[in-house]
Amino acid sequence: MVELESQEAVTVASTADIAVDVSLRLLAAATSLAAAVVVAANHQQRWGIRVDFTLFQVWIGFVAVNLVCTVYAAATAAAAARKAMGRWWLHHADAVVVNLEAAATAGAGAIGSIAMWGNEASGWYAVCRLYRRYCNAGAAALALSLAAVLLLGVACARSRYPKMPPTT
């Protein structure tokens, strides 16, 4: 006997499943917001030269993407709390946001790597020996952003095959 897709038993999401989704998304929002705030508030002045995140377009993009991810993760956490998960668009939107966050983190990490170790072939010198506090804050922001990527990635994987929320 052939079972049709419409005849499959529907697995209903438990309260614990919904709590996990909400928690993942709220943690992702918090870590993404923290990364944006750390970078935006990060500056150091030495020998009359002030460095801050506006010196590099990649850091401006990093802050913007992290703020967008914060808003998205908080909004989808609210949707999960209202049991509106399992919509057809959610996994696709999750995948886009995870990839944006990963790209922003990778781009900022590449610039941070050059700042840390330099690149003699292109004439870029390591500046983290001079601006240690600035670089340490940048590294902390990258770690927070990577945590947001991982949390959003797990939420994205969970949204791929969602359990349907219980009907009330």
Curated annotation (Swiss-Prot):
Keywords noted in UniProt: Cell membrane, Membrane, Transmembrane, Transmembrane helix
This protein's record includes keyword GTP-binding: no
Membrane topology: Multi-pass membrane protein
GO cellular component: a single term: plasma membrane
Extracellular face of the membrane: 39-54, 117-136
Membrane as UniProt keyword: yes
Highest taxon, organism lineage: Eukaryota
Major site of localization recorded for this protein: membrane
Location relative to the cell: Cell membrane
Residue intervals passing through the bilayer: 18-38, 55-75, 96-116, 137-157
Stretches assigned to the Cytoplasmic side: 1-17, 76-95, 158-168
InterPro entries: CASP/CASPL, CASP_dom
Subunit description: Homodimer and heterodimers.
PANTHER family in UniProt: CASP-LIKE PROTEIN 4A4, CASP-LIKE PROTEIN UU-1
Family membership noted in the UniProt record: Belongs to the Casparian strip membrane proteins (CASP) family.
Protein name: CASP-like protein UU-1
Organism: Oryza sativa subsp. japonica (Rice)
